[in-house]
């Protein structure tokens, strides 16, 4: 069975790719540049991960209209990228308004054209930053949208294998699957060495700490995030 991967180049999409590869899907990978600060590094990570898993069918999409819309510190350089707040319950400034719906719409279009019946995305609800478009209920609803908005014979289903995992579980699963974490990129701020202090870096570093493993990518600083 053929499956499309939404592959950002981050840790979650990497492990999702490893899971889909293990399950034997014929994989096609989509990467979206939406005007984010670290788009060049993320694109490099996408290509490296796709090379690692020998994924030859790829689509690199430009959706920089999301950057022009603004409203997120990931795309609007007038908004600072906030430091880590691992206990915060609010929606952070890094939230890109309705981003995942845009990504899914493009991925469903491509899936329909190339005959893919499954669509993988590395969304995480349990240990995410509180993004509303990373919740299971969102993907359940979007599967209904696909059912109503595509040809009856299309049969595309979104799969979210990480949705209920904690970040530390994702690291453990990735290690068990031999996922090349050194090719992934999570930092919101930097394309050189990861900053180590943005929310995404902090969640990643804490996950590796909880597993007793050193994250293989380079950091400007490596704070301890376990109390």
Curated annotation (Swiss-Prot):
Can you tell me which residues bind Zn(2+)? 187, 195, 198, 201
Q: Which top-level group of life is the source organism from?
A: Bacteria
- E.C. number(s) listed in UniProt: 6.3.4.20
Gene3D superfamilies this protein is in?
HUPs
Gene Ontology BP, a term:
queuosine biosynthetic process
Does the keyword Nucleus belong to this entry?
no
**Which residues does the record give as ATP binding sites?**
7-17
Q: Does the keyword Membrane apply?
A: no
Residues in the signal sequence: none
Manner of cofactor binding, per the entry note: Binds 1 zinc ion per subunit.
**What Pfam families does its record include?**
QueC (PF06508)
Keywords attached to this Swiss-Prot or TrEMBL record, sorted alphabetically, are: ATP-binding, Ligase, Metal-binding, Nucleotide-binding, Queuosine biosynthesis, Zinc
One Gene Ontology MF term: zinc ion binding
Q: Which reaction does it catalyse?
A: 7-carboxy-7-deazaguanine + NH4(+) + ATP = 7-cyano-7-deazaguanine + ADP + phosphate + H2O + H(+)
Span-the-membrane segments of this chain are none
**Cysteine disulfide links:** none
* Cofactor(s), by name: Zn(2+)
Its pathway? Purine metabolism; 7-cyano-7-deazaguanine biosynthesis
Q: Which family does the entry's similarity section mention?
A: Belongs to the QueC family.
Task: Name the job this protein performs.
Answer: Catalyzes the ATP-dependent conversion of 7-carboxy-7-deazaguanine (CDG) to 7-cyano-7-deazaguanine (preQ(0)).
Q: What is this protein called?
A: 7-cyano-7-deazaguanine synthase
| Species this protein is from | Chlorobium luteolum (strain DSM 273 / BCRC 81028 / 2530) (Pelodictyon luteolum)
Give the lineage: Bacteria, Pseudomonadati, Chlorobiota, Chlorobiia, Chlorobiales
């Amino acid at each position: 069975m053929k499956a499309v991967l939404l592959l950002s180049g981050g840790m979650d999409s990497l492990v999702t790719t490893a899971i889909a590869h293990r399950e034997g899907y014929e994989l096609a990978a989509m990467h979206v540049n939406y005007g984010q600060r670290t788009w060049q590094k993320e694109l490099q990570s996408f290509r490296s991960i796709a090379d690692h898993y020998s994924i030859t069918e790829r689509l690199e999409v430009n959706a920089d209209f999301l950057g022009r819309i603004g409203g997120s510190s990931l795309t609007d350089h007038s908004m600072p990228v906030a430091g880590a707040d691992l206990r915060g319950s609010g929606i952070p400034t890094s939230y890109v308004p309705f981003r995942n719906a845009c990504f899914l719409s493009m991925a469903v279009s491509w899936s329909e054209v190339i005959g893919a019946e499954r669509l993988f995305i590395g969304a995480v609800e349990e240990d995410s930053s509180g993004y509303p478009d990373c919740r299971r209920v969102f993907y359940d609803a979007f599967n209904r949208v696909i059912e109503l908005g595509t040809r009856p014979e299309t049969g595309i289903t979104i799969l979210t294998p990480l949705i209920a995992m904690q970040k530390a579980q994702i690291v453990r699963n990735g290690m068990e699957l031999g996922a090349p974490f050194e090719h992934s990129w999570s930092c919101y701020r930097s394309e050189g060495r990861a900053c180590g202090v943005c929310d995404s870096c902090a969640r990643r570093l804490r996950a590796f700490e909880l597993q007793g493993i050193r994250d293989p990518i380079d950091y400007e600083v490596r704070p301890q995030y376990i109390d």
